[in-house]
Amino acid sequence: MAKKKPFMYMSTNEWLGDPVTHFMKTGNALRSDENDELANISNLIPKIANGVKIEYDISYESPKDRIHGYKYTDLLTKVVMISPCNSTISVQNLINAIKKEPTEEGLAVVAKIKANLTDKYLLDEESDLPVKDLIILPGTNLLTKEGGWCDMEKIDKLVEEGAYVKLHPITAKVWQTMLMKRWGDKCINNDVALYPLLKKCDKAYFCMSSETGLSATLLGKKIGLIDLKERKGRGTFEHVYNALDRCGVKDTLYNKLAALFSHPESGFVCIYHDNYQERIDKYFAHMKETYKHKE
């Protein structure tokens, strides 16, 4: 089972690497030490830039023509992604970076990320199931949020055709019971490590709230979505997937993703980059010069 943490008081200032912040977000799902180096990046991110606040993992929408705030989140245990709280600007900004094409540095960075992909959470078990099609569910919060984000009928059909469903580490006990009953031996428990399964599958299905599609892209897997076509809200990584899809660049998804790690204007900062502060400063300078902000 996932290891448990002691009781902690609520955080009054959420920040990457803060144990209380992560406890309130993930409960008893303990984050792996593989995430620890990210603090070397997040500690350099200012609380305010271009006259607006920067917050960890908090999402909202600004008016379409300007930025009222920024958010940042961690992904793949090696990356901090900074983006404006404005989906239209977020997508366009990433498209502009992708069109610049990948550099040698960007390609080297994604190669290192690929070589070191690992689970974000400490999980106890590995599975030797013969998984070809793997469905990766989001946490309980998105299974239940405003009617749910997943197309459960599509998942049922995929399971009938032989797909396995991997439960998210943050899955409530009652949902574990319901989903195990629904999909039987095709349902993989939340305590089972994801990446050994992802590395051997042929195709991965995911929601746009999940970073898993980026992992699958790096691993050269076929990908598919399980999002409901009509749902409220936007996924954490939805602007990234939309930019990769809509950029109009005729190249592999791998190289498009490498382009985001090539140019600091994208807001992607990885532990394998040489100068974190320079990338952060260039990003906010670019955003100030290119887009309107709240006055």
Report each predicted region and the residues it spans.
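Leloir-type glycosyltransferase catalytic cores
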Residues: 78-125, 233-295
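A donor-sugar binding/catalytic signature common to diverse glycosyltransferases
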Residues: 192-239
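Phosphate/adenylate-binding glycine loop and adjacent helical scaffold
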Residues: 65-76
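Catalytic phosphate/metal-binding cores of nucleic-acid and nucleotide-processing enzymes, i.e., regions
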Residues: 121-131, 184-187, 191, 229-231
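Catalytic donor nucleotide-activated moiety binding site of glycosyltransferases and closely related
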Residues: 6-14, 136, 153-190
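Short, charged/polar "capping" segments at the starts of alpha-helices
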Residues: 15-20, 61-63, 143-145, 171-178, ...
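N-terminal pre-catalytic "stem/leader" segment of glycosyltransferase-like enzymes
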Residues: 1-52, 141-143, 148, 282-295
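Short loop/turn segments at strand-loop or loop-helix junctions that form parts
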Residues: 9-14, 56-60, 132-142, 167-169, ...
